[in-house]
Structures are given as C-alpha cells and as structure tokens.
UniProtKB/Swiss-Prot annotation:
Main location: cytoplasm
Subcellular location: Cytoplasm
Organism per entry: Levilactobacillus brevis (strain ATCC 367 / BCRC 12310 / CIP 105137 / JCM 1170 / LMG 11437 / NCIMB 947 / NCTC 947) (Lactobacillus brevis)
InterPro entries associated with the record: KH_dom-like_a/b (IPR015946), RbfA (IPR000238), RbfA_dom_sf (IPR023799), Ribosome-bd_factorA_CS (IPR020053)
Annotated function: One of several proteins that assist in the late maturation steps of the functional core of the 30S ribosomal subunit. Associates with free 30S ribosomal subunits (but not with 30S subunits that are part of 70S ribosomes or polysomes). Required for efficient processing of 16S rRNA. May interact with the 5'-terminal helix region of 16S rRNA.
Quaternary structure (record): Monomer. Binds 30S ribosomal subunits, but not 50S ribosomal subunits or 70S ribosomes.
Protein name per its UniProtKB record: Ribosome-binding factor A
Length: 116
C-alpha cells in the first residue's frame, strides 16, 4: 500500500513541477528543461527530480543546475499549495543522463547502418 502511495505522489510531483517550470518560473536558465522522473523516499520527506536539457554543452548544464537550485524554494512552496500532503518533501534536482545516452546509441546504430 505504501509503495502505491509513493508511486502516485511521484507522478503528481512530476506533473506539478513540469507545470510550475512552464508557468511560474521566469528564469531563462531553466527554459527547455524536461522533467523525466521523480523518486520519493519511503517516508515522503525527500524527492529527487530528474531532468534533461536539449543542449550538450557543459556550461549550459551548469547554468540550468544553478537556475533550478535558485528556483527550488518557489517550486517547493508551489507544490505545498497544490498537493494535499502533510509535509512537502525537500527537493533535489539531478540531471538525467539517459536521454543523452539514448541519443548517442541512436547515432552509433545509424553509423553502423550507413556502413553496411
């Protein structure tokens, strides 16, 4: 039962954070950020939000991370007003490398296909 609740909360946080980033956060450093997943601890006290960006540049990734860190307070307070839970979890943002990894695999497969 607890895992079911955690799963629902993860989906709800992902949906709400995506909406908040699109509509409430005005920082240009976080434009183009896609929330790819959320992991919430079993006690619902901490949430790790995984995101991806379209740019491959390291400087862009650093700027995005700084923008998200700066906006964490706003995002958490908005989540608190939108979610019906006792305590809003602490938020941490981590860049999701799986999108970049997947595109690299696609490039390698295309190269192999063109060599044949």
């Amino acid at each position: 039962m607890a895992q079911y609740r955690v799963g629902r909360l993860e989906q709800e946080i992902q949906r709400e954070v995506t909406d908040i980033l699109l509509k409430r956060v005005r920082d240009p450093r976080v434009e183009g950020v896609t929330v790819t997943g959320v992991e919430v601890t079993g006690d619902l006290q901490q949430a790790t939000i995984y995101y991806s960006i379209l740019s491959d540049k390291a400087s862009s990734a650093e700027k995005t991370a700084a923008g998200l860190k700066k906006a964490t307070g706003l995002i958490r307070s908005e989540l608190g007003s939108r979610l019906s839970i006792y305590k809003t979890p602490e938020l941490t943002f981590e860049q999701d490398g799986s999108v970049r990894y997947g595109s690299r695999i696609d490039e390698l497969l295309n190269d192999l296909h063109h060599q044949d």
